[in-house]
Amino acid sequence: LLALENTMQGKVLPTEYLAAASRLTREHGLALHLDGARLYNAAVKLGVDAGDITRHFDSVSVCLSKGLGAPVGSVLCGTADLITRARRLRKMVGGGMRQAGQLAAAGLYALDHQVARLADDHANAQLLADGLRAAGYDVEPVQTNMVYAQVGDRAEALKAFAAEQGIRLSAA
């Protein structure tokens, strides 16, 4: 199994790369899985339908809360056999929820209404990155909704300024 993440730290894997990965796994008899927690961010950035990305994969997981606003939940997509095996394994390890209809409804709403808003998230991330650059911070190029900046010894000052604006910052 080869598992790829798209986006990866906010960076989009090009469709040509995905096609090459698909060819490679086929040549070696491997399955190809997409961790699509931010699949729709990648699709919006590339200007393509999510299916243009997922067609290269044997299985895909999609998070409904990251960026789409559902309270919880993910979807696993694959063959009927894969889904049957996944359900069995989920039960074996104690997974599953009873009466999850309300959460499923929130997930469906997110898919129907929130994907179109991801371009706004991307634009806001770019606006933040531009502001940080203008203030003299070293910021990586932004493709989607994630901003990575090196703030050095000015971290506390930036955190305090952001807090005054009602923004919480996290750092690694």
Mark where each language-model region is.
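Conserved PLP-enzyme active-site core in the AAT-like
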Residues: 1-165, 169-171
